[in-house]
Regions:
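Histidine-anchored nucleotide/phosphate-binding helix
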Residues: 37, 56-73
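Extended boundary segments
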Residues: 126-129, 143, 333-370, 434-437
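Short beta-strand-turn/beta-hairpin segments enriched in glycine/proline and small hydrophobics
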Residues: 365-387, 407-421
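Ferredoxin-type iron-sulfur electron-transfer modules in oxidoreductases and energy-metabolism complexes
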Residues: 227-249, 259, 264-341, 374, ...
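Short histidine-centered loop motifs in beta-beta connectors
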Residues: 389-398, 402
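Short, compositionally biased
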Residues: 207, 241-244, 412-431
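Hydrophobic alpha-helical positions that pack around
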Residues: 76-186, 190-195, 204-205, 228
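Gly-rich Lys/Arg/Thr-decorated short loops/hinges at beta-loop-alpha junctions or inter-strand turns
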Residues: 38-51, 170
Length: 439
């Protein structure tokens, strides 16, 4: 396959990353080539709408970006995947497809339809290896927003802005386009918070994190949620791990619902959340069995086990997350099984998940609200795949729009990443964030 390294180098220098949540640099996925490119528009988290907005309103950029990915990697097939209920998006994309090697595949409305392991098998029939990546089987999966911005980078634009969904207790819920580094406070001032108690989340209700007004938009930020307190406690209880361990030891009913509904388990991957949480809760001095640790590494952290499946409100997902942070992945071979006969019957419909989370009232139409251009941005230096970024500017420096202001050293083989200024400005501060004021 012919790989266009010049295009891939432009993608690298632009700092484009996976915008579906992973944040893995796009160039690193593209540089080894592929046979199939999947533009993932499943947008499976409840209430999110920004990917649908992009597909409805920028279909030519998506198809051009998909073609760019194909020619850059040598791929012979391009596929746009999106849910069959996204009627407007499907119509917009179909009108732009002129080539026989590009197709649309429509997905059923379940969570998590966008999981790469599940998506790749559904679309291609190929199975991602245990603990592996789609690139190992000749498939690259990019979020549709990544594909959109790839087309802009090829036109010479820097990757400095992104789209986000703003949902919940706000007067103007919908899609916003903002510079990377925009403070949540500035966004919510535009969206107009209602005068009610709320708690903030970012990125997703199932896989996202707690947030506050001082947070700033990162490359991977996909959404801001302002939820009522009573709802937010269901979505993300943020329980300390020692309490989770004690609760599991005393309250686990051994019902196996967490495993029975686990999408990765149903897909045949070696993970059994009920065994992991039991083994961890009964371990002494964190002497956890290696097989338990190895299984935890197959968790996608989708959250079904703790938010939907467990009748005792235990937290297998948080246990898996903790194990992956606290323990090195062991050299234990776990085989892959056939997909469960119950895979289709146990898919979790989004409508049922929304009802369980008590968030029906916050569903909103796919609509663009505004482009926000604040006078100041705060660009984080942490949280990037590869390494902590090192600033390339100092206090009082003037910077131009698109200028690389921080990057990491990729000469040692590390994954390269950078961040660019979203406008002409002056550096006010260089600490854990680079603060830029517009001039």
């Amino acid at each position: 396959m012919a790989i266009d390294y010049e295009v891939i180098d432009r993608i690298k220098k632009a700092g484009l990353v996976g915008l579906g949540g992973g944040g893995f640099p796009t160039y690193a996925k593209w540089q080894d080539g592929a046979e199939i490119i999947i533009a993932n528009g499943a947008e499976c988290e409840p209430l999110l709408i920004k990917d649908q907005f992009i597909m409805e309103n920028y279909p030519s950029e998506i198809i051009n970006g998909l073609k760019l990915a194909m020619t850059s990697t040598g791929a012979k097939k391009g596929i746009v995947t999106l849910k069959e209920k996204y009627k407007k998006s499907i119509l917009s994309i179909e009108r732009q497809i002129k080539d026989s090697n590009i197709a649309i595949i429509k997905l059923p409305d379940f969570y998590p339809a966008g999981d790469e392991f599940i998506l790749v098998e559904h679309v291609t029939g190929r199975r991602v290896p245990v603990g592996g990546f789609p690139t190992q089987i000749g498939v690259i999966v990019n979020n549709v927003e990544t594909i959109y911005f790839a087309s802009l980078v090829e036109r010479g634009e820097a990757f400095t802005h992104k789209f986000i969904s703003v949902i919940g207790q706000v007067k103007k819920s919908g899609v916003y386009k903002v510079p990377i580094g925009t403070r949540f406070e500035d966004i919510l001032n535009n969206a107009v918070l209602l005068d009610k108690p709320y708690r903030l989340f970012k990125d997703g209700l199932m896989m996202g994190k707690n947030a506050d007004l001082t947070d700033a938009v990162e490359k991977t930020t996909s959404a801001i949620f302002a939820l009522p307190i009573e709802v937010s406690n269901i979505v993300n209880s943020s329980i300390p791990i020692d309490i989770i361990k004690r609760r599991a030891r005393s309250a686990c009913e051994k019902c196996m619902f967490c495993t029975d509904l686990c999408p990765r388990y149903l897909s045949g991957y070696p993970i059994e959340p009920h065994r992991i949480i039991r083994g961890f809760s009964l371990s002494v001095d964190e002497n956890v069995d290696e097989k338990i640790i190895a299984m935890a590494y197959n968790c996608s952290e989708c959250g079904i086990c703790e938010i939907y499946a467990c009748p005792m409100w235990l937290s297998p997902r948080q246990v898996n997350r903790y194990i992956k942070m606290a323990f090195k992945k062991p050299d234990v071979s776990l085989g892959i099984n056939n997909k469960s006969d119950y895979f289709n019957e146990r898919k979790l419909p989004i409508s049922r998940l929304i009802n369980r989370l008590f968030i029906n009232e916050f569903k909103t139409d796919v609509k663009f609200i505004s482009e926000i251009e604040p006078d100041r941005v705060e660009l984080p230096l942490r949280g990037y795949a590869g390494a902590i970024l090192k600033p390339l500017v100092k206090n009082a420096d003037s910077v131009r729009m698109g200028q690389v202001i921080a990057s990491n050293d990729d000469t040692s083989g590390k994954i390269y990443n950078n961040v660019c200024s979203p406008f002409h400005g002056k550096i006010l501060s260089v600490k854990d964030r680079i603060v830029i004021e517009r001039i």
